[in-house]
């Protein structure tokens, strides 16, 4: 899980979603998981 100020999709499987007001990136590749904060 990477925490960064700006989350960007890395590959085409990455999806940007909002969960409880937190912007997240979910992907099939666990290394691409990100969270904004």
Swiss-Prot record:
Keyword flag Ribonucleoprotein: yes
Example GO molecular function: structural constituent of ribosome
Pfam family membership, one: Ribosomal_L36
Superkingdom, natural source: Bacteria
Keyword annotations from UniProtKB, A to Z: Ribonucleoprotein, Ribosomal protein
GO cellular component: cytoplasm; ribonucleoprotein complex; ribosome
Tagged with keyword Amino-acid biosynthesis: no
GO BP term (any one): translation
InterPro entries xref list: Ribosomal_bL36 (IPR000473), Ribosomal_bL36_sp (IPR035977)
Family designation: Belongs to the bacterial ribosomal protein bL36 family.
PANTHER family reported in the protein's UniProt record: 50S RIBOSOMAL PROTEIN L36, CHLOROPLASTIC, LARGE RIBOSOMAL SUBUNIT PROTEIN BL36C
Name the record gives this protein: Large ribosomal subunit protein bL36
